Amino acid sequence: MGMIRKTAKTGILVLLIALLVSCASGRPAGKRDNGEPEKQEEQQSEEMQEPVQDQEEVEEEAAEVNTDNITINTQSSIRIEGDKIIYIDPYKRTEAAHDADLILITHAHYDHFDEPSLKNVAKDDSVIVCPESMLADVTRLNIKGQNKNIDAGIVSMNAGDTEEICEGITVEAVPAYNLNKNFHPKANGWVGYIIIVDGVRYYAAGDTDALPELEDVACDIAFVPVGGTYTMTATEAAGLVNKIKPAYAIPIHYGTIVGRAADADTFGAALDKDITMVRKVEDAK
């Protein structure tokens, strides 16, 4: 019996010594000093870092926002080139390019709804987006691509609508009308567009004043009219753009029919410093 007590006391003493050694070494009792715990900690650390690494990869794969793929031959006649070719309000497009994957029409005025230009840029499988109020007019034009009628490719929209046009391209329609003049009445149902292409958001305002409901527009690149008379002025346009805060602002609708080249200067000077103005209208004077 005394032998059992002595052995128990000895065992307890050995266990206490082992615990003290373990505390001193910072290593749990019973773990061998063979580097295995350290390897496990390193592995756990690497696993914890993986989500951060994945986030960096996502950022690298995100579409780069720039304006190199944009041309504007005149007025508000915009062409965006990428995996898909997009035209907005094509006007005075004299070359029979027949390369448009998507054509967007903001309203019915001749410098935005130009039949010869539409027929020059359309191809057999083009999709045309227009205000719902213009659907009959667009259909009546009987726009053809190289070989056939493309009426089946017409999508009509009202402000507030969103349409997925194809993989990688979504279009949102936003209001476009005048507040203090009657050139573009709200009742006409004309619109501007936000075109989302592989994550990059292009805002084409159409002919509009600086409407309160446009202050919530989210975009990377904004095309806004600056010529005044029929639309907002350069100063008003800058005020709107400073609220929606795109990376780039491109003035349109000036320098030919209405407005002067100097309107772009006024617009650019009034922009916040973190917004870059880019001139694209080729014939502005």
Mark where each language-model region is.
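Bacterial N-terminal signal peptides that target proteins for export
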Residues: G2-I12
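C-terminal motif of bacterial Sec signal peptides marking the signal peptidase cleavage site
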Residues: L19-S22
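Core dinuclear metal-dependent hydrolase active-site scaffold
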Residues: P28-E42, E46-H98, L102, G153-A218, ...
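Active-site metal-binding motif and surrounding structural segment of the metallo-beta-lactamase
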Residues: Y91-D137, A218-F223
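Active-site environment of divalent metal-dependent phosphoester hydrolases
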Residues: T94-E95, H109-F113, L135-V138, D161-E164, ...
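A short acidic, amphipathic alpha-helical/loop segment
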Residues: E115-V121, R140-N142, E213-V217, E236-L240
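Binuclear metal-ion centers of metallo-dependent hydrolases, dominated by the metallo-beta-lactamase
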Residues: N142-I165, I169, A238, N242-K285
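Charged helix-capping and loop-helix junction motifs
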Residues: P185-G189, M232-G239, D263-T266
